[in-house]
From Swiss-Prot:
Belongs to the SMEK family. It comes from the Eukaryota. This is Protein PPP4R3C1. Residues 777-788 have a biased composition (Acidic residues). Pfam families: EVH1_PP4R3 (PF22972), PP4R3 (PF04802). One of its GO terms (cellular component) is nucleus. Residues 730-813 are annotated as: Disordered.
């Protein structure tokens, strides 16, 4: 809806007075407050239009007289400010105390311009009016100078606009720093707290929080000083979003007291430690976790904390006696547990601060700590009955491994050279702490899992002057430490419940399941990153079978750990692993767990199906055959996935392929074996002919002697007939071959001399005529496995009638 602007508007000309502040934009685009007065709208004969008139509150003199132009853009902001510009770099602004007063004047302006009074801008602003976007700063900046309880609201409303203007942020930071403004605000805090003025306290919370988010190092130094810190904390207690104030000051004064474990000589070091603790407390505890859009709001405070920690570590290292005194007291058996806890907690915080150092500096620090005896101290204190000390010792050990795993590995191997007792080695002691952790949160186990991952990670192992660190340390680890690590798995016992026909493990409580899960996670890591070493260990200790026993646990997360371990092994597609799984029938516990899970569609169901699906996709033939032949009956009824039917299909395809391969091999080998028989017959017939000729010649020369064995006259003819018959047919091959062999043996070459020596000489003479026959397809090992993996017994039955004759010596003419 619009109103005609040509006609003179019908405006109520009653004398309406509203208190306002008037601002004018100067040539440098800075706003100047020209005074406070009362505003009214009335028709001016001189200006020929409706004007906005402001008269001073103090003396009634005119402060502003501006005609409402039909084509000038006016804008209303925050319900209390009206701004406009009549010329370039010339702006006007009026700030009302009450929104209703502002709305009355705004309706007059919209009526003159023919606009809807519900809009907040009458026309599009030009580039010259960009400064008006932040007009609320005008009123609030003026209120800043008047630090009073009644101005706290306007001061608090200033910060959201300042954060959008980097130039204004720096200006505000300078103002707060130079005017002693923080001190004035904290004086108001005491007043409001004494008067229990909750509204004022809420505004002060937002103001102090806004100052922190200015992210200015100079302001941080003021706010975290001894003079102001506790009052700053007090302001932050009154969060308007909470029903009750927090008790930060009570905690800091009663529970968190700064104590010098070792007297600090340097005052600068003491000041840095206190300031760092205060900043860390405010950053971590008192301020809410920033969103992804606010990650840089406190970047300067985190930077200050970072460099403060570096300075603290450096100053402590430069003090030669400080660390010496700490370790001498830790090694002293006469000190009490309370004192030992204090020293250990200091050492833990010292190591935590050292995380900020560069790698080279960390190595130097760790070498210094090892030289001072930190490892031997940890071995002693970790055996103490105080749980806080045990966790502290593990935390320190974790920091050292994180700083330089190479140095810790080197220390571990040097330590082992001087000790034959594996239980006395540092890493074994720490592993024992993990195994004996009775904390429901399993805190020590979590720490040691991360430590062992770091120590066993081959990516941070290097090649040293003494050789490859990976090979040396892993050999050492599997020899001296692995037995301790897998002890919880090997100690598991099983019991059979006849009522539900199931096997259960014991112990099977949640705490033990957590431990076993952590050990399995480490072993899975080993399978992935140093497979050769863990493979030997698995085979020699039958470790996979022991791990799969855990699939009878009542804790699903532990069963999943076991499945994940086996899945990692199968994922390697290693033939030795596959043979081991088949030989030990290790799919049985997996299938049992799957069947006991029933029709529940959960992580266990998905994990086991994924394992079998991987085998199917990768076509691991040996495993497919084992699964289908032994377990397909259990999977036959499963229809909601095609994995198991796919395994059956793969199995049938492989079986068909083997059968076809066997047929192809038979078609190639059968003719060659047949011609081999024919060649054998030819050689033997020639031998008969040779022997017959020699005998006939000897008979013509002198006749046969009594006692000589002469072949029958029909022997040659019979053998020749048999030979010719085999040329035409292959029927009754084995029987005929047997007759030939007997006939050949009977037809020995005999000389005409009757004595036995002469007979032996004739045999030798005949044998020397022909060398041994070398057949192309002969093999010396009759028990060799079929290269295609066929069943030997089945082949013997199938090829019984086609077995070739054994090799024999033969003669030729």
């Amino acid at each position: 809806m619009t109103w005609p602007s040509e006609a003179r508007p019908n405006i109520n000309m009653e004398y309406r007075l509203h208190t306002v502040k008037v601002y004018v934009m100067m040539e440098d685009k800075q706003w100047k407050n020209v005074g406070t007065g009362q505003i009214s709208s009335k028709y001016s004969e001189q200006l020929q239009g409706v004007c906005l008139l402001v008269h001073s509150l103090s003396d009634g003199s005119p402060i502003m007289e501006c005609k409402i132009h039909p084509n000038v853009p006016y804008q209303k902001q925050q319900g209390k400010i009206i701004i406009w510009s009549e010329a370039k770099n010339h702006g006007m602004a009026i700030h009302f105390q009450e929104p209703n007063d502002c709305q009355e004047i705004w309706e007059d302006i919209c009526q003159i311009q023919g606009k809807d009074p519900h809009v907040e801008i009458t026309q599009e602003l030009t580039d010259d009016l960009e400064t008006f976007e932040h007009m609320p700063l005008i009123w609030n900046w003026v209120e800043m100078s008047n630090c009073e309880i009644h101005t706290l609201k306007n001061i608090a409303e200033l910060f959201p606009f300042v954060f959008e203007m980097p130039s204004q942020k720096e200006r505000l930071a300078l103002f707060l720093e130079n005017e002693g403004y923080i001190k004035k605000l904290l004086q108001l805090f005491h007043t409001c707290e004494k008067l229990k003025n909750m509204e004022g306290l809420y505004y002060l919370h937002n103001i102090i929080k806004g100052i922190l988010f200015l992210n200015n190092t100079r302001l941080f130094n003021i706010m975290f000083s001894d003079e102001f810190f506790m009052d700053i904390v007090g302001c932050l207690e009154y969060d308007p979003a909470l029903d009750q104030p927090k008790q930060y000051r009570e905690f800091l004064t009663q529970n968190s007291k700064f104590k010098e474990v070792i007297p600090i000589i340097h005052s600068q070091l003491r000041q840095k430690i206190q300031q760092t603790y205060r900043m860390q407390y405010v950053h971590d505890i008192m301020l809410p976790t920033p969103s992804i859009f606010q990650t840089n709001l406190l970047s300067d405070i985190t930077t200050m904390i970072f460099f403060n920690k570096i300075n603290i570590i450096t100053m402590i290292q430069e003090d030669e006696n400080f660390l010496l005194e700490v370790f001498s007291q830790l090694k002293d058996n006469s000190i009490g547990d309370e004192r030992r806890i204090e020293l250990l907690l200091f050492l833990k915080e010292f190591c935590e601060f050292a995380k900020t150092l560069q790698s080279q500096k960390k190595n130097e620090l760790l070498k210094t700590l090892i030289k001072l005896g930190i490892m031997s101290v940890l071995k002693v204190v970790v055996h103490m009955n105080d749980y806080q000390i045990q966790v502290g010792a593990l935390d320190i050990f974790a920091y050292l491994v994180e700083y330089s795993p190479c140095l810790v590995r080197a220390y571990a191997m040097e330590e082992a050279q001087d000790s034959e007792d594996n239980d006395d080695l540092l890493i074994n002691i720490m592993i024992k702490q993990m195994i004996c952790d009775f904390d429901p949160e399993f805190s020590q186990g979590i720490i040691m899992t991360a430590v062992l991952h770091e120590l066993l990670n081959p990516e941070n192992m290097r090649t040293t002057a003494k050789g490859c660190e990976r090979k040396v340390f892993l050999n050492f680890f599997y020899k001296r430490y692995m037995r301790k690590l897998i002890a919880p798995i090997l100690s598991i016992r099983v019991k059979y419940d006849s009522n539900d026909n199931r096997v259960y493990i014991c112990p099977d409580n949640y705490q033990n399941a957590q431990l076993l899960g952590a050990v399995l996670e480490i072993l899975t890591f080993c399978v992935q990153y140093h497979s050769m070493y863990i493979k030997h260990y698995i085979f020699s200790n039958n470790l996979l079978r022991s791990i799969l026993v855990l699939m009878s646990s009542k804790h699903t997360f532990l069963i999943l750990c076991a499945v994940r371990f086996m899945r990692k092994i199968i994922g390697l597609k290693d033939k030795m692993y596959n043979h081991y799984i088949i030989k030990k029938n290790l799919f049985e516990p997996v299938v049992n767990a799957f069947m006991h899970n029933g029709h529940r569609y959960n992580m266990l169901n998905s994990a086991i199906i994924e394992l079998f699906e991987f085998i199917r996709k990768e076509n691991i033939t040996s495993l497919i055959v084992n699964i289908v032949e032994n377990f397909f009956r259990a999977f036959k009824s499963i229809e909601y996935v095609q994995t198991f039917k796919g395994l059956k299909t793969k199995y049938e395809e492989e079986k068909k392929r083997k059968s076809q391969r066997r047929k192809n091999l038979h078609s190639i080998m059968h003719p060659k074996m047949y011609y081999r028989h024919i060649e054998d017959m030819e050689v033997k017939v020639k031998a008969d002919i040779c022997c017959r000729g020699i005998i006939e010649e000897e008979e013509r020369q002198g006749g046969g002697e009594e006692g000589a064995i002469l072949p029958m006259g029909s022997d040659f003819t019979n053998n020749y007939d048999i030979f010719m018959k085999n040329k035409d047919t292959n029927e009754s091959e084995s029987a005929i071959e047997g007759q030939k062999i007997k006939s050949s043996e009977a037809s020995e070459c005999c000389p005409s001399h009757g004595d036995a020596s002469a007979t032996r000489m004739s045999r030798s003479h005949c044998s020397s005529l022909v060398p041994l026959v070398d057949y192309l397809y002969d093999t010396d090992d009759e028990n060799d496995d079929d290269p295609y993996g066929n069943d030997k017994h089945e082949d013997e039955h199938e090829d019984e009638d086609e077995e070739p004759p054994p090799k024999r010596p033969n003669l030729s003419t």
